[in-house]
């Protein structure tokens, strides 16, 4: 058994968003995501087969959900449940420092 800290090895600069899988079973996947000024490429949307619960642990981000008039701004501690196949995209993450997300992907019961 290993003890680790979610804020260990958080880089100060990244050419691409970093995704670390912390736990994976057939029913659930837990990821730490680090973004520094990253966004979903223009015209692309996430359309995932699993539900995703995400929380911002550090930094800030804006998420767009298809069909909603305004982006959702997420600050430290803000979380969001994205149901399977709800199309969404990351519009912006803070370029001044790392945004650290914790994402839990799970099957619909």
PLM-predicted stretches and their roles:
Residues 32, 58, 65-67, 84, ...:
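Residue-level recognition of conserved beta-strand positions in structured domain cores
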Residues 1-45:
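A short, N-terminal "cap"/entry segment at the start of jelly-roll beta-barrel domains
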Residues 20-22, 42-48, 64-66, 72-73, ...:
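Short histidine-centered beta-strand/loop micro-motifs
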Residues 68-84:
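Short acidic-glycine-tyrosine-enriched beta hairpin
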Residues 75, 84-109:
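Ligand-binding loop in jelly-roll beta-barrel domains
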Residues 27, 68, 95-97:
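Short strand-connecting beta-turns/loops that link adjacent beta-strands
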Residues 47-63:
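Short, conserved beta-strand element in jelly-roll/cupin
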């Amino acid at each position: 058994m290993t003890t680790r800290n979610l804020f260990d090895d958080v880089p100060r600069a990244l050419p691409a968003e970093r995704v670390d899988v912390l736990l994976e079973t057939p029913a659930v996947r837990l990821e730490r995501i680090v973004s520094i000024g990253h966004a979903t490429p223009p015209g692309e949307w996430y359309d995932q087969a699993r539900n995703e619960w995400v929380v911002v642990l550090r930094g800030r981000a804006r998420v767009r959900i298809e069909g909603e008039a305004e982006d959702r701004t997420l600050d430290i501690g803000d979380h969001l449940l994205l149901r399977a196949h709800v199309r969404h995209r990351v519009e912006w993450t803070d370029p001044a420092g790392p945004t650290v997300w914790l994402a839990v992907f799970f099957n619909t019961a």
